[in-house]
Amino acid sequence: MVPSKRVYFLLIFGILIAPTIAIFLSIPTSILLTLLFDVVVLVLMLIDGLRVRRHRVQVTRELPSRLSIGRDNPILLKVRSEKVTATLQIRDFYPTEFGVSIPLLNATVPGNSTQELTYTVHPSQRGEFPWGDIQVRQLGAWGLAWDNRKILHSLKVKVYPDLVGLRSLSIRLTLQSSGVNRQSRQLGIGTEFAELRNYRMGDDLRFIDWKATARRVGTHGNTPPLIRVLEPEQEQTLLVLLDRGRLMTARVQGLQRFDWGLNATLSLALAGLHRGDRVGVGVFDRQMHLWIPPERGQHHLSHLIDRLTPIQPVLLESDYVGAVTSVVQQQSRRCLVVVITDLVDVTASVELLAALTRLTPRYLPFCVTLRDPLVDRIAHTPESEVTAAYTRAVSLDLLAQRQVAFAQLKQKGVLVLDAPASQISNQLVDRYLGLKARNLL
């Protein structure tokens, strides 16, 4: 039981009027009346608090089975009140590592009704976390006391990579393949036959299938010519090498670089599996920490999520040559090799440059780096103060050194994508779909 603000106000009021009473009566009488008044207030508070216990509300919590890192995950509290209107303060003991939209929930629930309260948690790291109980304060009918109790509702929750983003990407890819968004299937794009359809105004005459048209005319009479529609080749191999070394431990926009890279890895894997390709993933630091052989099918995505989620970055220098050597030993046929890492400059990244150029021309190497928007913002914001100007100069130099390294990679035939961390997944998927459409694999 916790006194309300009204109780403190009444007690202070009793003390303040004591001098006035002493003027008209005596000081002992004033003290006696003040004490009597305070006792009455405290007794009423006790009665008010005890009465609440007969009408305690019921509170239950509902949350997603899998929380997504870097996303606002909705948490639902259902409050059921019987007979009387309940004024409540509810605090949910979510993991302390999470950000939260509303730490303390206030609600007034009418009698014989259920009210839903929603707030969001924002995890910034993956793993398993303890979720505590629910603290509920219910105000008495006289407004003098809060009934303070704890509802046992502790459990363990798991934070996964960005599953919300994967669901959105899956919908987007499904719309593309179903024809709602027709960018993924156009005349002349791809090498595999997809379908025959009627000729439309503006179609390229080179793609008319005259044999199929002749057979159709012989069967159905005068009909429009048939056009061959091609689509990108399937059952190719896509390998993703995800760096978990020292450079990937830095935080960018609230998440570690490794987490952004892991989200991009799963997004690219989803796109590859959706396009019918075989997808394999390797996670490396000084050695190949985890190797998942290439497979096809949507079931493989669940396998990738389960295997990759527990992995965390480490403060070790990465062995890029060793990782590339493992790929060469595992995969003899031509494939797309995507290396997700970070790059500082030519000097610091000499091993990365050597490893990627080793893959050409037998493989198609693709270097993906995660740019920090804060560095971009500092570099492109004019400053008048000396200290800020030096910081800006360093940022400009970092960006220039990165561009020199990227230029060397491109000269060696390595594909390059350098994008802000929050945009890396979408841009990487778009580049992959573009490569498929142009048959570069």
Each predicted region: which residue ranges?
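Extracellular/lumenal glycan-associated context and N-glycosylation machinery
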Residues: 1-60
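C-terminal signal-anchor/stop-transfer transmembrane helix together with its immediate cytosolic
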Residues: 3-9, 210, 348, 432-441
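An amphipathic, basic-hydrophobic helix/alpha-beta surface used to engage anionic
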Residues: 39-299, 334-339, 347, 354-358
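Short beta-alpha junction loops
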Residues: 287, 370-375
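Short, charged loop segments at secondary-structure junctions
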Residues: 290-319
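Acidic, Ser/Thr-rich peripheral helices and adjacent loops at domain boundaries
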Residues: 301-304, 374-404
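Exposed acidic/Ser/Thr-rich ligand/metal-binding surfaces
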Residues: 318-371, 418, 438
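Long, C-terminal catalytic modules of enzymes
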Residues: 381-384, 396-441
